[in-house]
């Protein structure tokens, strides 16, 4: 063809072969038919048009024509001779040169027979060298090391480590997929001896560039693609077979390797690459580079985890350390019943470190000095941990390493939050401080002693005895949740009674036999952090003393309290929390504000014991403890709801400050409090929380109406005293919990929002009777309406339609609309096949045989702004005429014509003004009348007989009349149908 001759005459380019991957049938004469597998020889590419259409020859059908390039795939490379490196090019060096490590699948195909021979020879040589290296690994060069340890590898120097690892990775990749890369280079003798590793470190595992000057080999490692320069990016795409003009776009737009990895398919259009096919191929290459980087990083991690090298010890994450000397001293001082063998083993573990696999480092000074010591013999594991006392506190196994949190203070390794889930709990690890230091305060609040077996738990491990009145020897933080003697009478005498009550209450819990509760010890005040946590979790919703109508959700607050307490608590020491420190650390003081606000508004304890604060006795020394000790909520005796002594704070009455009588009263009222389920708060039932609050509140008001006035007076007195004490202090500051209470007062929970609270009811509902609404309605009548849900309840309602306002009444006697539906931009449709089940259900209930639905507009549409809930509404009527009437009325109401926008028609015929058109119409009518008159005259002149459909013979015509031209022009052979 002429196009082919012109192209070949220029001799500008020679194109590679392509293979068809999809079938293409030509739609025009100059196109080319293709089937999958056809070889296409490119004659002209889309260099002039950049439209993705090539001109080529189908070698199967010998036809030529245009075809889309995306239907084909390249099977040959433009310059394949530059990609191969001859085996003799570096004869003096035994290194390995590879081609492109992750070439695209488009470069895999058929090449010439000579190239295939070289490829198969290279592949065979590579595989034989790999097999030879594997044999040497098993037998020859590493024979001595493997005899000691099966995973022992020869020690290599630090510069050789990276090259050796890269070589192992390349071998693994070639074994997994030998046909993935179309570029193979021959390999030399592969040996893992020390000399060969030195040669390998000198060799460059890289990709050769396809630049015309192939003497300078660029380092194009796919793993280092992020550090490529724009020139290296250009060289890479030139290497994989893209034309030079496309590759130069990356250099022109300064696309580095980091930018290249962030490019998407739509970004390539900004590089002035107009062909979609080329952009798609480049995007596939970018994905191949990303996958190569990901696979190399994954394989590198897998390979490095197999070998434990000395120079990698500093790169690993620091593991949890255990001071075995201190543990050994504690075990030897506290435990005298250990056997001689276990004591010998423990004494030897202090001097000679216990060997573990390199993945778990017990001591930061742990090093692998001897190959025999690097791997722990698995036969010794049962012997090492045969003694049960090893894993008892404080000799249990170390905590796994964890990343430090930037916002959380350093916690002790004594307890991991991972072990507190449900029943899978472990005994907490404890560390005993010296005698002259403060007692241990546990960050997560689990103290290892049992409340049920306090007599039996004094054998091996004991906590030091402490005096509750000595503030110097007994300094407790907030998380210990103790109740000191602040203006109380005989508090120490009341503590055993509290312990008895708590032990009786906790004995009914199904999980009280777990390890945590067996090793659980209470503080001297009779409570523990476990009880505090259970108490917080069972707290009723906080209600203000002054605005009882407002509600607050306690579950989130209690969780925040526990989290803040867990952050604030220290391990080896404790200190008093002063108000000045609270100013600096507002988050740490949130738990104080939480309990102080509870104590002010609800000053009663679950056991009817009340602690009051005398403002006159609140000195600066004791004020630091007043916020945490002004309440009596730290005594929780059960996590179970059935046997809980926890009652709602507003349901209990105040009692005088007498600890003995109060505790006895609480002990006697335990069954009654457990039976009074209306007074027990149920925070887990979030859906009906609001409803249950009001029910319990009304029941309590009815039952305790006599004590109402005295309770309110005592509350006001208590609050006024505490308020005066805090206002008098200059250090008083409003806590975040109080701000939260005020902010949440005006916010209703979303779950409590009902239909009556929507804008349709608050703004759109009219107070009008059904009969009055019928008079002005476009359509009205009885219909059945389906409720919400898949199988909602069908209810009979009386509907009235006013424009796009569809309202309904429960009956015709209603004086107010019960519901409203805004049908703006809705579509009314009959029930389709998908709604057949709904229609059958409505018909089976006798609600109506004919069903239709109202479909709201699509979300986000301009006309879809309705003030009612946009959902599908189903209606049913009894007969067909009613359904037609409703459909007609609703369709008319939903037709939306915007009269503010002029109507623009696509009819492009030129028009004339209306006045001119009317003048022409009058002229046309006059011409029509004149024509009709002439026709009547012609009929009379010829004497046409209509009955016989022929000219009347009574009117003869002379021959000479036809010879005159005037007569011919005037007569013009008139017929009844008009002129001819």
UniProtKB/Swiss-Prot annotation:
UniProt-recorded name of the protein: BEM1-interacting protein 1
Cellular compartments annotated: Bud; Bud neck
CDD domains recorded: PH_Boi (cd13316), SH3_BOI (cd11886)
Native source organism of the sequence: Saccharomyces cerevisiae (strain ATCC 204508 / S288c)
Residue ranges annotated for the PH domain, each copy included: 776-895
UniProt feature, compositional bias: Polar residues: 141-150, 415-438, 645-662, 669-683, 737-746, 950-968
Domain SAM intervals: 228-292
Gene Ontology biological process: actin filament organization; budding cell apical bud growth; endosome organization; receptor recycling; retrograde transport, endosome to Golgi; septum digestion after cytokinesis; vesicle fusion to plasma membrane
Modified sites of kind Phosphoserine: 104, 106, 128, 209, 393, 412, 525, 528, 589-590, 593, 644, 655, 735
Residue spans of biased composition, Basic residues class: 687-703
């Amino acid at each position: 063809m002429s196009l082919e001759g012109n192209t070949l005459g220029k001799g500008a380019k020679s194109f590679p072969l392509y293979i068809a991957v999809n079938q293409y049938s030509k739609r025009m004469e100059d196109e080319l038919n293709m089937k999958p597998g056809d070889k296409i020889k490119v004659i002209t590419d889309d260099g002039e048009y950049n439209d993705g259409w090539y001109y080529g020859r189908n070698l199967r059908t010998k036809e030529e024509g245009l075809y889309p390039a995306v239907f084909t795939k390249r099977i040959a490379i433009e310059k394949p001779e530059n990609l191969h490196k001859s085996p003799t090019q570096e004869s003096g060096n035994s290194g390995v040169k590879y081609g492109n490590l992750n070439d695209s699948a488009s470069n895999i195909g058929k090449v010439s027979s000579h190239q295939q021979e070289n490829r198969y020879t290279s592949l065979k040589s590579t595989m034989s060298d790999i097999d030879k290296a594997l044999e040497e690994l098993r037998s020859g060069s590493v024979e001595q090391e493997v005899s000691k340890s099966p995973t022992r590898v020869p020690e290599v120097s630090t510069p050789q480590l990276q090259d050796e690892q890269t070589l192992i990775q390349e071998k693994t990749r070639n074994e997994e997929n030998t046909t993935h890369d179309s570029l193979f280079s021959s390999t030399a003798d592969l040996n893992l001896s020390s000399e060969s590793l030195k040669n390998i470190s000198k060799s460059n595992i890289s990709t050769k560039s396809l630049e015309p000057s192939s003497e300078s080999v660029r380092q194009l490692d796919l793993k280092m693609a992020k550090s490529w320069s724009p020139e290296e990016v250009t060289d890479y795409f030139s290497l994989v077979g893209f034309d030079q003009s496309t590759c130069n776009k990356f250099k022109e737009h300064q696309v580095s390797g980091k930018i290249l990895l962030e490019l998407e398919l739509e970004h390539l259009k900004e590089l002035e690459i107009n062909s979609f096919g080329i952009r798609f191929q480049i995007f596939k290459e970018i994905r191949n580079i990303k996958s190569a980087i990901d696979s190399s990083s994954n394989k590198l991690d897998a390979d490095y985890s197999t070998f434990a090298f000395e120079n990698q010890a500093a790169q690993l994450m620091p593991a949890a350390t255990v001071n075995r000397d201190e543990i050994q001293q504690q075990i030897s001082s506290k435990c005298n019943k250990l056997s001689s063998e276990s004591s010998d083993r423990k004494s030897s573990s202090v001097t000679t470190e216990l060997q573990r696999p390199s993945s778990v480092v017990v001591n930061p000074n742990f090093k692998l000095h001897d190959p025999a010591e690097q791997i722990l013999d698995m036969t010794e594991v049962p012997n090492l941990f045969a003694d049960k006392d090893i894993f008892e506190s404080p000799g249990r196994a170390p905590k796994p390493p964890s990343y430090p949190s930037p916002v959380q203070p350093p916690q002790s390794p004594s307890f991991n939050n991972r072990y507190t889930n449900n029943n899978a709990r472990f005994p907490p690890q404890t560390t005993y401080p010296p005698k002259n230091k403060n007692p241990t305060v546990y960050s997560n609040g689990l103290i290892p002693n049992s409340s049920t077996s306090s007599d039996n738990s004094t054998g091996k491990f004991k906590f030091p005895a402490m005096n509750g009145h000595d503030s110097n020897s007994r300094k407790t933080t907030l998380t210990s949740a103790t109740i000191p003697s602040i203006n109380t009478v005989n508090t120490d005498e009341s503590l055993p009674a509290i312990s008895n009550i708590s032990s009786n209450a906790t004995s009914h819990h199904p999980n009280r036999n777990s390890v945590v509760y067996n090793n659980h010890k209470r503080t001297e005040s009779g409570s523990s952090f476990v009880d505090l946590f259970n108490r917080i979790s069972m707290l009723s919703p906080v209600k203000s003393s002054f605005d009882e109508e407002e509600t607050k959700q306690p579950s989130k607050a209690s969780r925040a309290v526990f989290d803040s307490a867990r952050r604030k608590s220290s391990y080896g020491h404790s200190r008093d929390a002063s108000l000045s420190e609270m100013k600096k650390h507002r988050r740490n003081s949130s738990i104080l504000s939480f309990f102080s606000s509870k104590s002010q508004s609800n000053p009663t304890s679950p056991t009817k014991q009340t602690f009051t604060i005398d403002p006159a006795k609140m000195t600066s020394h004791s004020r630091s403890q007043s916020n945490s000790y002004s309440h009596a909520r730290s005594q929780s005796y059960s996590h179970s709801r059935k046997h809980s002594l926890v009652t709602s704070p507003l349901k209990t009455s105040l009692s005088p400050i007498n600890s003995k009588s109060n505790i006895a009263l609480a002990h006697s009222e335990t069954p009654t409090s457990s039976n009074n389920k209306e007074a027990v708060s149920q925070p887990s039932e979030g859906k009906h929380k609001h409803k249950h609050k009001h029910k319990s509140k009304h029941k309590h008001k009815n039952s305790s109406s006599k004590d109402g006035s005295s309770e309110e007076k005592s509350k006001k007195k208590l609050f006024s005293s505490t308020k005066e004490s805090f206002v008098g202090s200059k250090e008083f500051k409003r806590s975040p919990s109080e701000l939260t209470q005020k902010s949440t007062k005006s916010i209703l929970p979303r779950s409590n929002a009902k239909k009556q609270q929507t804008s349709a009811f608050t703004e759109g509902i009219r107070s009008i009777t059904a009969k009055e609404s019928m008079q002005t309605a476009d359509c009205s009548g009885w219909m059945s309406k389906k409720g919400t849900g898949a199988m909602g309840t069908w209810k009979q309602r009386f509907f009235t339609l006013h424009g796009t306002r569809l309202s309904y009444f429960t009956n015709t006697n209603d004086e107010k609309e019960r519901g409203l539906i805004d049908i703006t931009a809705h579509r009314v449709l009959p029930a389709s096949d998908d709604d057949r089940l709904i229609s059958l259900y409505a018909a089976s209930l006798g609600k109506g045989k004919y069903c239709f639905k109202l479909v709201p507009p699509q979300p986000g549409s301009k006309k879809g702004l309705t003030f009612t809930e946009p959902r599908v509404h189903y209606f049913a009527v009894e007969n067909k005429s009613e359904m037609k009437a409703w459909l007609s009325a609703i369709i008319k109401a939903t037709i939306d014509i915007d009269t503010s926008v002029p109507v623009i028609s696509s009819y492009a015929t030129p028009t004339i003004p209306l006045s001119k058109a009317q003048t022409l119409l009058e002229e046309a009518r006059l011409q029509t009348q004149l024509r009709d008159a002439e026709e009547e005259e012609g009929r009379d002149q010829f004497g046409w007989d209509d009955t016989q459909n022929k000219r009347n013979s009574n009117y003869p015509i002379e021959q000479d009349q036809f010879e005159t031209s005037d007569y011919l022009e005037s007569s013009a052979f008139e017929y009844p149908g008009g002129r001819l």
